[in-house]
């Protein structure tokens, strides 16, 4: 656990220096988002936590950007939590591999995590992220859909599926998933920009 906390501190400093604009469609952006979400991680719950319902209601209803950011961070905090030390270890090793851009190794660690905790939504979401970075979009889609089966409110997975659809130039699919993400969390500027991009590309494809 101490190693995990030290890693989060190091990642925060790296992120402050190197974070890319959220609306760019690059591997660096996705890694920046991944590590940003990691900063609020703990180890004692998951997507079934009873605190989430009220947080989602507050996130959707607030018009205050600062408050929305707080609610969103709390949701990610809970999603990242888990009680099992083996799951925690697999998550740590997967994150460490991603930090070194060792995506195949990260895939192995997150696959072990999924084997240990097949009903832990964030495990599937993390492996989906690695698969996206490896360019294995169809496999990434499958893991995203499993994430959504376990946590239908996972706006991160929905927006991630939107990015996959953009990569595949499936503009209709991209629009659907990005809109779905914004229905749950309407405050994601990067997703709003991605949606505008997908709509523009769809319009161009029809002319």
Task: Tell what function each PLM region has.
Residues 127-128, 161, 195:
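Residue-level signature of tetratricopeptide-repeat
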Residues 43-92:
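N-terminal leader/linker segments that initiate helical-solenoid repeat arrays
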Residues 84-156:
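Alpha-helical adaptor scaffolds
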Residues 29-40:
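Bacterial N-terminal signal peptides
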Residues 99, 133-134, 167-168, 200-204:
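Register position in tetratricopeptide repeats
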Residues 50, 61, 70, 77-81, ...:
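Terminal, low-structured helical/coil segments at or just beyond the last alpha-helical repeat
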């Amino acid at each position: 656990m101490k190693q995990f906390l030290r890693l989060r501190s190091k990642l925060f400093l790296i992120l402050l220096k190197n974070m890319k604009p959220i609306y760019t469609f690059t591997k660096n952006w996705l890694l920046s988002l991944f590590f940003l979400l990691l900063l609020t991680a703990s180890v004692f719950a998951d997507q079934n936590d009873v605190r989430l319902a009220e947080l989602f209601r507050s996130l959707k209803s607030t018009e205050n950007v600062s408050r929305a950011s707080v609610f969103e961070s709390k949701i990610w905090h809970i999603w990242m939590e888990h009680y099992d030390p083996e799951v925690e270890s697999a998550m740590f090793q997967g994150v460490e591999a991603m930090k070194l851009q060792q995506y195949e190794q990260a895939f192995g660690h997150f696959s072990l995590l999924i084997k240990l905790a097949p009903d832990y939504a964030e495990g599937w979401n993390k492996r989906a992220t690695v698969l996206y970075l490896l360019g294995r979009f169809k496999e990434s889609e499958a893991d995203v859909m499993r994430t959504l089966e376990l946590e239908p409110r996972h706006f991160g997975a929905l927006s991630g599926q939107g990015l996959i659809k953009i990569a595949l130039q499936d503009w209709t699919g991209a629009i659907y998933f990005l809109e779905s993400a914004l229905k749950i969390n309407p405050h994601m500027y990067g997703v709003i920009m991605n949606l505008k991009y997908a709509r523009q590309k769809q319009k161009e494809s029809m002319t």
